[in-house]
A protein has these predicted regions:
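An N-cap/entry alpha-helix motif that binds or orients negatively charged groups
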Residues: 1-41, 105, 110, 114
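Short secondary-structure transition/capping segments
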Residues: 10, 87-91, 178-179
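Conserved alpha/beta-domain cores
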Residues: 48, 56-59, 110-126, 130-240
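Active-site cofactor/substrate anionic-group-binding motifs, chiefly glycine-
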Residues: 48, 57, 64-84
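A short, small-residue-rich loop immediately preceding and capping a beta-strand
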Residues: 52
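Short, conserved acidic/polar surface loops in the N-terminal third of protein domains
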Residues: 64-68, 86-93, 146-148
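A gly/proline- and charged-residue-enriched helix-loop-helix capping module
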Residues: 79-130
Length: 240
């Protein structure tokens, strides 16, 4: 009934209502989660109960981490988070593809910004019963004067509140973001991020992943692969 009702609404409205219901502890039906030892795996020191996780984009503001973990996800990645709050692109910006059972989004990193989301993360970790892997996905503001500084700011503010950090340079919806994937620029970004990481005791050993776009050409992929190997990048999140 609820799902059918939500499908009658504009997709972004349906998403917002779902988040409000989850925040209010509304008893949305959930399967009783079962753990299977064969699905457990440890990657870069992180113990994942299973490999199926919730990607960034659903819980942009870290409001419903506990609820989503209770559905059985092996991890939840929040964000993308930018230093300052921003509204994102003009609506409508989410479109249903009924026949493909999919959606297209043109959101543009809409989120509440570091300061407010930091409070949400602190609130989540106050619960002694929390369990699960949390990733922090960070990006740059649309109007920033220095994109690299945006990433460094987010890492300093939020890095200690996730099991891993994702550097999002993949979105086509933020002007200039994908330019950070270009040879030279991406290496400068990574080196500055690693320097910042080494300055902060709480995150010095946390994995940092780079999220790249799905439509890079072969030369670009080769450049990123070689740069990643040369700079000991822990991993890539491939496709948006």
């Amino acid at each position: 009934m609820l799902i059918n009702f939500l499908r009658l609404l504009p997709p972004e409205t349906a998403h917002q209502i779902t988040l409000k219901l989850l925040k209010s502890n509304f008893k949305i039906y959930r399967n009783k989660t079962q753990q299977f030892k064969t699905l457990k795996q440890t990657i870069l020191g992180i113990d994942f109960p299973n490999p199926l996780g919730l990607a960034a984009g659903f819980d942009k503001n870290a409001e419903v981490i506990k609820s989503m973990l209770s559905f059985g996800f092996g991890f939840v990645e929040v964000g993308t988070i930018t230093p300052k709050p921003q509204k994102g692109n003009q609506k409508p910006r989410i479109f249903r593809l009924i026949e493909d059972e999919a959606v297209i989004n043109h959101l543009g990193f809409n989120n509440d910004g570091c300061e407010k989301i930091l409070k949400n993360l602190k609130s989540f970790y106050k619960n002694d019963n929390y369990a699960g892997v949390v990733g922090i996905n960070i990006g740059k503001n649309k109007s920033t004067q220095n994109d690299i500084d945006d990433y460094l700011y987010c890492i300093e503010k939020l890095g200690s509140y996730g099991n891993y950090i994702t550097i999002n340079i993949s979105s086509p919806n933020t002007p200039g973001l994908r330019d950070l994937q270009l040879r030279g620029r991406i290496e400068t970004l990574i080196k500055k991020i690693q320097n910042k990481q080494n300055e902060i005791k709480q995150i010095i050993n946390k994995p940092i992943f780079i999220k790249i776009s799905p439509d890079l050409n072969d030369e670009q992929l080769r450049d990123i692969a070689l740069m990643s190997l040369a700079n000991n990048v822990k991993g890539l999140i491939i496709s948006n």
